[in-house]
Amino acid sequence: GWLNEDGFGHISTFGGAELGCIAALKTLEICSREETRSMVHYIADYVGQRLAAVQATYPDWFVGIRQNGVILGLEFAHPQGAKYVMRHLYENGVWAIFSTLDPRVLQYKPGILLKPEVAEEMLDRTELAIGKAYAEIRNERRSA
């Protein structure tokens, strides 16, 4: 279904072209700016705190948060849990992809240039998606 149609994720942002090198250099310059680094720290803290609150709501479903700055892995109790959350996020306009090495884990990467108001909306949608995925799993278990 939907994962084969809409679930593709590309891996290389700057690979394979000279123009990619120019874009990569500009990206490094932007990432080195003090205001960018300051915002990354703010967003990372905010995202971590909000996700911890969501995890407290679903402790038996949303079982782990792995975080390094704005790169996160969200771990779910179901063997394919991240796929459920990924689909509900996608339906709510948020792109994240499950880990092919461990489909319990969702790769969640908000980005370094995220504005606080966008982060808040993204996290509201994430909380909704996690809740919907949890309800879906519970309904499947009851039906089985």
Question: Model-found features: residue ranges?
Answer:
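Conserved N-terminal phosphate-binding loop of PLP-dependent enzymes in the Aspartate aminotransferase
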Residues: 1-144
